[in-house]
Amino acid sequence: MLVRLLYASRAVDTSSEAIEAILSQSRLANPVGGITGILCYGGGIFLQAIEGGRMAVSELYGHIQKDLRHKDVVLLHYEEISERRFGGWTMGQVNMSRINVSILLKYAERPELDPYSVSGKVSLALLEELMATASIMGRA
């Protein structure tokens, strides 16, 4: 059974090297576990959608909760799915500082990434729009 999980967290280290390390690790490990998804980052906040088998997604989320590179990890949305929305990416990436602010303002009060202040469904809609507007990089 496929599931989709959406969570937010705050980055402990916001350097480009730290973010690249997370992406590189994900792109190596995720194919082995049948995991796909995207990671958005901006303003020290991560918003990530992960898709795959129920056990694989649950195990990965448990690992993320214990990962010292993340703090304030919050589950935003979880659902069983019939097909993947982010199946083309072992871990796509979106640097929110490079996104047109009008996209962010469509889903939030301020032009910044803050999944803590909106519903999980709104955050998922933002990710879907970023995918539709080809804002996701790192297809692997």
Map each language-model feature to its residues.
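Charge-rich, low-complexity N-terminal segments
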Residues: 1-140
